[in-house]
């Protein structure tokens, strides 16, 4: 899974207002329409993390980001092949257990896949 790096990419995903979430996380997603390249077998999933100062100090925020990266990699196969994801942490994510975050991300990614399949 690649990373969303530019501010423009983050804003594009967040402005679409498509989201799924849980108690401690919100998953904003965007599935681009122009993904019909020469090779459709390639997978282009990009992940961005949004962990604000309301979550905690720098050490806490970095811990939350590390957890999100590990869990997103573990569940990325649930997502459509071409999509941009922004995982946004709610303040309660700092105190949530790893198992709880794991369940929430798996459920949110499955919800994203279901919503994309319906559209």
From Swiss-Prot:
UniProt cross-references to InterPro entries, sorted A to Z: Ribosomal_Su5_D2-typ_SF, Ribsml_uS5_D2-typ_fold_subgr, RNase_P
Catalytic activity: Endonucleolytic cleavage of RNA, removing 5'-extranucleotides from tRNA precursor
An example Gene Ontology molecular-function term: tRNA binding
Top enzyme category: hydrolase
EC number, as in UniProt: 3.1.26.5
Keywords: Endonuclease, Hydrolase, Nuclease, RNA-binding, tRNA processing
GO biological process: tRNA 5'-leader removal
One GO location term (cellular component): ribonuclease P complex
Transmembrane feature ranges: none
Family that this chain belongs to: Belongs to the RnpA family.
Record text on subunit structure and interactions: Consists of a catalytic RNA component (M1 or rnpB) and a protein subunit.
Function in brief: RNaseP catalyzes the removal of the 5'-leader sequence from pre-tRNA to produce the mature 5'-terminus. It can also cleave other RNA substrates such as 4.5S RNA. The protein component plays an auxiliary but essential role in vivo by binding to the 5'-leader sequence and broadening the substrate specificity of the ribozyme.
Protein name: Ribonuclease P protein component
Record organism: Bifidobacterium longum (strain NCC 2705)
Gene: rnpA
